[in-house]
Structure formats: C-alpha cells, structure tokens
C-alpha cells in the first residue's frame, strides 16, 4: 500500500485518487446544463437512495450522503436547495466538555410525491416532506 506523507499527514494514495475522482465528478455535475440532464446523471450514477419519475433537480450540486435521500415522483427542487443528512454540533459540545460524550447526528430525508421545494431551502436530517407540499423559498 503506497502512502503519501509529509511532516504532519500520512494518506493512502488510493484515498487521494478517489478524492480527485469525486471532485471531478462534482465539477462535471455542476456543468450539466439542464435539470433533466442532472436527474438522468443522478439516476445513471445511482447517487441517491431513490429517485422517482418526473423530478426536476435545479441545484448544481448533490449531497455527499445521497444514499440517505429518497425523492419520490413529481418533485421540483429549485436552485440552491441543500439536503443535509448530518450535522457537526457534537464537535462543539465535545470541545466544551473536554471529552467525547456526544455522537454525530445522522439521519435520512424523504420527499414524497407532488412536492415543490423553493430556492435556497435547507432540508435537515430525519425530515419527511409529505405529499402535496410546498416548502417556501429560503426555509
């Protein structure tokens, strides 16, 4: 196993190769011109746990934890929407306590049928957006 090393960091070279590939995938995804082409790419690359039919994906990025995201049918996702499947608040609390007492909070997100999610919204862990819903922009 080859490793890259400097004075403070040792990293497996296969990890570096994987990180470079993921970075290039994200750059490529950002440059896909239409929402429908982005949906087709997400399906082809199997980036989400579930991606239904007639989905409009306007954001120029996809979540790192995509396997925790289910999007059902007839869903429109506007620009700059972010799906966050985890947080890092445990890092703050652990720093206050001086020892590791809190664990990382990780959850899934599910968006049911006939949903519109407005621009700039952030959907947090363990949220299920029910059918026939509108999520206001910036919420």
Question: What residue spans do the PLM features occupy?
Answer:
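Terminal amphipathic alpha-helical/low-complexity segments used for targeting or macromolecular assembly
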Residues: 1-48, 90, 132
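Intrinsically disordered, low-complexity boundary segments flanking structured domains
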Residues: 14, 44, 70-72, 139
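Flexible, glycine/small-residue-enriched loop-and-beta-strand segment within the central core
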Residues: 38-39, 56-129
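Generic detector of intrinsically disordered, low-complexity, polar/charged segments
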Residues: 49, 115-117, 135
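Cytochrome P450 catalytic-domain "roof"
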Residues: 51-53
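Hydrophobic, membrane-inserted alpha-helices
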Residues: 55-56, 135
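Short, intrinsically disordered, charge-balanced linker/junction segments flanking boundaries
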Residues: 132-139
């Amino acid at each position: 196993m080859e490793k890259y090393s400097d004075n403070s960091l040792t990293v497996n070279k296969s990890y570096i190769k994987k990180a470079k590939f993921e970075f290039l995938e994200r750059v490529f995804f950002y440059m896909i011109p239409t929402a429908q082409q982005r949906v087709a790419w997400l399906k082809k690359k199997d980036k989400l746990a579930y991606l239904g039919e007639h989905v409009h994906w306007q954001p120029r990025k996809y979540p790192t934890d995509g396997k925790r995201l289910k999007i059902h049918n007839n869903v429109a996702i506007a620009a700059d929407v972010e799906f966050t499947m985890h947080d890092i608040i445990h890092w703050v609390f652990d720093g206050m306590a001086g020892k590791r007492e809190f664990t990382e909070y990780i959850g899934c997100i599910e968006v049911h049928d006939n949903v519109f999610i407005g621009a700039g919204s952030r959907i947090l862990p363990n949220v299920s957006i029910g059918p026939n819903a509108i999520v206001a922009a910036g919420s």
